[in-house]
Regions:
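Histidine/acidic residue-rich metal-binding segments in metalloenzymes
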Residues: 2-8, 20-38, 46-88, 99-113, ...
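Active-site beta-loop-alpha junctions enriched in small/polar residues
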Residues: 10-16, 42-46, 72-74, 95-97, ...
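Short, electropositive alpha-helical surface patch
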Residues: 24-30, 166-172, 204-210
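Divalent metal-coordination and catalytic microenvironments
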Residues: 39, 70, 92, 115, ...
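Short acidic/glycine-rich loop or secondary-structure boundary segments that cap or lie
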Residues: 76-78, 116, 123-126, 156
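H/E-rich (His + Asp/Glu) clusters that bind or coordinate divalent metals
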Residues: 127-148, 152-184, 188
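Mid-to-C-terminal alpha-helical segments outside catalytic/metal-binding sites
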Residues: 172-211
């Protein structure tokens, strides 16, 4: 409150471990359920498909947790489909590979499923070779609810400002693109509708003041 920053917590299962370990994490979280808004799936994606965790995600939903998962960053586009169809996630974390499948793009648009992209992390992990190759601009042009995030700033060289700045510089993003990215972030958030509207209105007012 002192810094006027609000937050919601997402607990993550580590995909390089087995589902049994994820169930242990779930059980450990239950006494603190009132503090946790959702569960996710992260760590090494290659060789660890979302389908490994169907049962624990189903049980997590039974406990009222919202569901998200890392998919389609280092792993194939099939992992995005698995996260959507098998884990029933409401958002895809990363999701860079979605553009490989036009039918998937249509699904994301129809269901208003957004992506949390981490450009500097993608560069550091060699998901992209250059920032100019990042897919976020094409995603925005297709109407996908793309957003920009920092992943693990201490490891990957940048907090939110650096990610926005380097992406905008590399892709020549204009003010409309930047405004849409900020609006998308609030649209995808788990804030109450009136709070979302308030923040989105502030974003629009700021960008309008620049004209």
């Amino acid at each position: 409150h002192e810094l006027k920053i609000s937050y919601k917590l997402i607990m993550s299962y580590l995909r390089h471990l087995c589902e049994k370990e994820a169930f242990k994490t779930l059980e450990s979280s239950l006494p603190y359920k009132h503090l946790i808004d959702g569960v996710g799936l992260d760590s090494s994606e290659k060789g660890n498909p979302p389908s490994k965790f169907i049962n624990v995600f189903k049980e997590s939903a039974n406990h009222g947790y919202k569901l998200v998962a890392h998919a389609g960053e280092e792993g194939p586009v099939d992992y995005i489909w698995e996260a959507l169809n098998l884990l029933k996630v409401v958002r895809i974390d990363h999701g860079n590979r979605c553009l490989d499948d036009e039918y998937l793009v249509q699904k994301l648009l129809e269901k208003k499923i957004g992506l949390t992209l981490c450009p500097l992390s993608n560069l550091e992990l060699k998901v992209i070779q250059r920032m100019e190759h990042h897919p976020v601009l094409e995603m925005l042009q297709k109407g996908i609810l793309a957003t920009i995030h920092s992943d693990d700033p201490a490891y990957f060289g940048g907090y939110m400002n650096e990610n926005y700045y380097e992406t905008a510089k590399a892709l020549n993003l204009n003010e409309e693109h930047l405004m849409q990215l900020a609006i998308n972030a609030f649209e995808l958030s788990w804030l109450r509708p009136k709070v979302k509207e308030k923040h989105i209105s502030q974003v629009k007012s700021y960008f309008n003041s620049l004209k």
